[in-house]
Swiss-Prot record:
Component of the YIP1-YIF1 complex, composed of at least YIF1, YIP1 and YOS1. Keywords: Endoplasmic reticulum, ER-Golgi transport, Golgi apparatus, Membrane, Protein transport, Transmembrane, Transmembrane helix, Transport. It is a multi-pass membrane protein. GO terms for cellular component: COPII-coated ER to Golgi transport vesicle; endoplasmic reticulum membrane; Golgi membrane. GO terms for biological process: endoplasmic reticulum to Golgi vesicle-mediated transport; protein transport. Its main location: endoplasmic reticulum. The keyword Membrane applies. Belongs to the YOS1 family. This is Protein transport protein YOS1. It comes from the Eukaryota. The keyword Protein transport applies. It is found in: Endoplasmic reticulum membrane; Golgi apparatus membrane.
């Protein structure tokens, strides 16, 4: 019973990471105000650790660091589902 829940949790986490990894900055992120732009650099005295900037950094990190590992993980999950699914 616990293993069934962990498997579903793994699939949900993998799906969410895949969703963040494929977000297009030009098409989607800029429309909702989460694109990386140089004209929004904070001036002296402004806090640059806002929630919005942290979300933009998290999306950029996921897209940069997890793109190649996600390809391998997705291939393993597809093969697992085809053989044992």
């Amino acid at each position: 019973m616990v293993l069934f829940g962990l498997g579903r949790l793994f699939y949900v986490i993998l799906l969410l990471i895949n969703a963040v990894a494929v977000l297009s900055e030009e098409r989607f992120l800029r429309r909702i105000g989460l694109g990386r732009s140089n004209d929004e650099t904070p001036v002296f005295g402004q806090d640059q650790n806002t929630t919005k900037s942290k979300v933009v950094q998290l999306i950029g990190a996921v897209q940069t660091l997890l793109r190649i590992p996600l390809i391998g993980i997705n291939i393993l999950v597809i093969v697992y589902e085809l053989l044992l699914g």
